């Protein structure tokens, strides 16, 4: 981490006689790339992978048969297990049909179920956009005082199921707000007396609820936990391990391609100052959509995310006001000839951005989708304008009002760029109407961006204040409301909770686009919760983030 002595403010170039004084620039002293050429050296046994694919096909048919022959609570549990194991994406059609049938019988079944099954049904339906009523939980409350019954506190599995279900709620689900408080308090109190396997599972959930976790990381964790359970299904376990490792092999190949691209353009070598984080940039699109059919989308989105990260560092740390004005202007022109007006050290970045998008536009044109590139261009123009506005705030010493700051953050957080990049590279799920919708910044996108910025700022504001940075949302809130840091953090964390409820509400059917689209965008919120869970896991990528990426991209599961 950079210390205060590493950081110095901008000074404008001064002319004394005929010699200009050297410009003094800020530096964040970012640590180097922790992956090096690992993926370039990685080799795979294709014969072994093909054998794994054949075995996985056989097991998939067995899972399909099992899914079609069971009913009721047993089917609910199987669907939930498939999600935890990370293989539900292989059975989307069958699960959708099953949940539609379950939704139609929701009210009738709710009168008969125990808390564990009822909460599981509610959560699965809400996760898939079905507006299951939370009123079904009223039967677990006392009629006199409205509190949850004492018997609920002694039902650990029921409480755990209710706890997880509570996070798919909206602002209208007041009972779920009470449930979060009730279950968190009672599960925490009961934790020391639980058997080890259950205690580990409960502690994992209390650390971060399932609804905020990423499927691939959750699958890696759950496969290990599932194997420890003596009641596990050996066929399901083997299938989950094979599927995880096969996907990991695909993701490794994508990272090999990305590392080749990144090494070839060598922007860090040419520019020296930015964060070298191409593997960490891959974390965002991998979190958004990990399935095989989205391979191209992940590759393109990672390239754009890494280039945007360098642009962010240029505006945040390194560039002078005059240089940033020039760069903002040439980005708006989007013309390779315009690079002549840029300082030499910025030219490689401009060239790489325009060339990367041009190459992709040519690829898209072969399938009649060249129009997508114009949306990507506009997203880049928009974010550079937002970055420049915030750089002006910093240089003027301005602390904006909270909503003014968050309005800018709807663009500068980077999620409109990342989402546009994901869908620009995606397959048939992308339409012109979808890209127009994202560009128009509907409330769903604004909420996702709001959550992104607040979560980011809560975890990074102290370091950025030391480095020299535009005022964070924490500083803006303290200034506007004349409160202390703890009060500001309490209110902002409450804002995050409420924004999650709005995001959940937006994913209720009918939705403006298919659930697969809505979930890709919602997954970007989950990436923030994970990547910034213990601090800035992107800038400081050599600890927890490295461990998580090892699980995702390096270490296969023993089969």
Curated annotation (Swiss-Prot):
UniProt pathway annotation: Secondary metabolite biosynthesis; terpenoid biosynthesis
EC number: 4.2.3.104, 4.2.3.57
Keyword Lyase: yes
Tissue: Mostly expressed in stems and, to a lower extent, in leaves, roots and fruits.
One of the GO BP terms on file: beta-caryophyllene biosynthetic process
Cofactor: Mg(2+); Mn(2+)
The protein's enzyme class: lyase
Reactions performed catalytically: (2E,6E)-farnesyl diphosphate = (-)-(E)-beta-caryophyllene + diphosphate; (2E,6E)-farnesyl diphosphate = alpha-humulene + diphosphate
Sequence motif: DDXXD motif, positions: 312-316
Binding-site positions, Mg(2+) 2: 312, 316
A Pfam family hit: Terpene_synth_C
GO function term, MF aspect, one: magnesium ion binding
UniProt: Mg(2+) 1 binding residues: 312, 316
Cofactor note: Binds 3 Mg(2+) or Mn(2+) ions per subunit.
Binding site for Mg(2+) 3: 456, 464
Keywords: Lyase, Magnesium, Metal-binding
Top-rank taxon: Eukaryota
Record-stated family: Belongs to the terpene synthase family. Tpsa subfamily.
Physiological role: Sesquiterpene synthase involved in the biosynthesis of volatile compounds that contribute to the characteristic flavors of black pepper. Mediates the conversion of (2E,6E)-farnesyl diphosphate (FPP) into beta-caryophyllene and, as a minor compound, into alpha-humulene.
Domains: entry comment: The Asp-Asp-Xaa-Xaa-Asp/Glu (DDXXD/E) motif is important for the catalytic activity, presumably through binding to Mg(2+).
PANTHER family per the UniProt record, alphabetical: ALPHA-HUMULENE_(-)-(E)-BETA-CARYOPHYLLENE SYNTHASE (PTHR31225:SF93), OS04G0344100 PROTEIN-RELATED (PTHR31225)
Protein name per the record: Terpene synthase 1
Organism whose genome encodes this protein: Piper nigrum
Organismal lineage: Eukaryota, Viridiplantae, Streptophyta, Embryophyta, Tracheophyta
Gene: TPS1
């Amino acid at each position: 981490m950079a210390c205060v002595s590493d950081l110095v403010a901008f000074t404008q170039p001064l002319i004394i006689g005929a010699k200009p004084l050297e410009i003094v620039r800020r530096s964040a002293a970012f640590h180097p790339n922790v992956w090096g050429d690992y993926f370039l050296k990685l080799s795979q046994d294709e014969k072994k992978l093909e054998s794994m694919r054949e075995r996985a096909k056989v097991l998939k048919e067995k899972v399909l048969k099992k899914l079609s022959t069971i009913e009721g609570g047993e089917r609910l549990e199987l669907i939930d297990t498939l999600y935890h194991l990370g293989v539900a994406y292989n059975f989307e059609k069958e699960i959708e049909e099953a949940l539609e049938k379950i939704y139609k019988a929701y009210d009738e079944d709710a009168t008969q179920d125990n808390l564990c099954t009822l909460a599981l049904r509610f959560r699965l339906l809400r996760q898939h956009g079905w507006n299951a009523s939370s009123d079904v939980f009223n039967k677990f409350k006392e009629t006199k005082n409205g509190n949850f019954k004492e018997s609920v506190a002694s039902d650990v599995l029921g409480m755990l199921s209710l706890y997880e279900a509570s996070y798919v709620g909206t602002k209208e689900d007041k009972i779920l707000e009470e449930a979060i408080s009730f279950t968190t308090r009672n599960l925490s109190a009961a934790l020391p007396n639980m058997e080890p396997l259950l205690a580990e599972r409960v502690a994992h959930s209390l650390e971060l609820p399932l609804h905020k976790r990423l499927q691939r990381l959750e699958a890696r964790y759950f496969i290990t936990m599932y194997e420890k359970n003596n009641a596990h299904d050996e066929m399901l376990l083997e299938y989950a391990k094979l599927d995880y490792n096969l996907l990991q092999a695909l993701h490794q190949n994508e990272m090999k391609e990305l590392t080749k691209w990144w090494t070839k353009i060598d922007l860090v070598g040419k520019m020296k100052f930015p964060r070298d984080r191409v593997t960490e940039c891959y974390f965002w699109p991998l979190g958004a959509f990990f399935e095989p059919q989205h391979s191209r989308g992940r590759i393109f989105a990672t390239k754009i995310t890494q280039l945007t990260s360098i642009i962010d560092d240029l505006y945040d740390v390194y560039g002078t006001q005059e240089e940033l004005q020039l760069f903002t202007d040439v980005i708006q022109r989007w013309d390779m000839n315009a690079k002549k007006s840029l300082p030499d050290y910025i030219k490689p970045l401009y060239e790489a951005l325009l060339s990367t998008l041009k190459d992709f536009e040519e690829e898209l044109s072969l399938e009649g989708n060249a129009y997508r590139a114009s949306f990507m261009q506009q997203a880049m123009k928009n974010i550079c304008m937002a970055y420049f506005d915030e750089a002006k705030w910093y240089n003027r010493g301005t602390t904006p009002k909270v909503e003014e700051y968050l309005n800018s953050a709807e663009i500068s957080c980077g999620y409109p760029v990342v989402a546009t990049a994901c869908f620009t590279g995606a397959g048939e799920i992308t339409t012109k109407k979808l890209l127009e919708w994202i560009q128009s910044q509907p409330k769903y996108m604004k909420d996702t961006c709001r959550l992104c910025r607040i979560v980011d700022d809560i975890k990074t504001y102290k370091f950025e204040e030391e480095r020299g940075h535009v005022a964070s949302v924490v500083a803006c809130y303290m200034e506007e409301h004349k409160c202390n840091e703890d009060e500001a953090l309490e209110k902002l964390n409450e804002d995050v909770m409420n924004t999650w409820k709005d995001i959940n509400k937006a994913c209720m059917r009918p939705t403006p686009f298919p659930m697969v689209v809505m979930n890709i965008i919602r997954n970007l919120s989950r990436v923030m919760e994970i990547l910034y869970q213990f601090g800035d896991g992107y800038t400081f990528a050599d600890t927890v983030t490295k461990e998580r990426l090892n699980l995702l991209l390096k270490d296969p599961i023993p089969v």
